[in-house]
Amino acid sequence: MVGRLLDSMTLGRKARRLVTLITLLVLAACTSREVIVEGSFPTPLVDPVPVSVGVLFTQEFKEHELVDDATGRGEVSWRVSTGTAQVEFWSTLFPAFFQNVVFIESYEDLQTYDVDAVLIPKVADVQYAIPLYTNVKVYEIWMRYNLSLVEPEQIIDEENASISLENMQPFAEWPLTAYGKTPTAFMQSDIDAVNLAAVMALRDAGANFITSFLRVPGVMDWIKNPEEAQ
């Protein structure tokens, strides 16, 4: 009788341990991870395009983040903040690519600085793919941008002394895609792997911008006659 009681108690303890272990595994699977993308972005060596460009980073662009709530799927949820890295990267590339660049922060900047056009980048979409095997930390990230070139007057709201993008009519508008992949399967953490994939995607975006810009419809005509952009 005593032996049966002890066996029952032992089984009970094992069952409780098993339940605890399963609970911990479920909680681990449903945790969330946050990445604030940061990396090194070398200045590209290119012959500058002979125009003066204002660059406008919207608040949405500066604060861009990818949020994937995977709790319903029993997977890890991700929040990947790319905004700061986006601004840092493009703030390095644009001044190297154009002869003169002014970063537009306000209505007063548009009134003060004489630029041929204003370039407005927008992150249209970011997607990611997780590894098939948990011990292989290779992530993939896709980015898609919409870029617009517009005459400065198009975004000036004189009545409210502000910048308005509501009714702008760009004379050049085009999509830009980028892809990044963690270059090694031996990263120390998933967070590091996602960060590096995002950095690679940003660098790819820059390379694609440099090689495709002069082929965008309307751009060459504008470069030849910046005063006559339509």
Where are these regions (language model features)?
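Sec-dependent bacterial lipoprotein signal peptides
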Residues: 1-30
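A structural "domain/chain start" motif
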Residues: 30-92, 211-230
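Surface-exposed short loop/turn segments
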Residues: 31-36, 106-173
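Short acidic, glycine/proline-rich loop/turn micro-motifs
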Residues: 66-71, 131-133, 185-189
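Short secondary-structure boundary motifs at beta->alpha junctions and helix caps
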Residues: 74-82, 152-212
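Sec-exported extracytoplasmic/periplasmic mature domains
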Residues: 94-103, 206-218
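Surface-exposed patches in mature extracellular/periplasmic domains of secreted proteins
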Residues: 102-109, 219-223
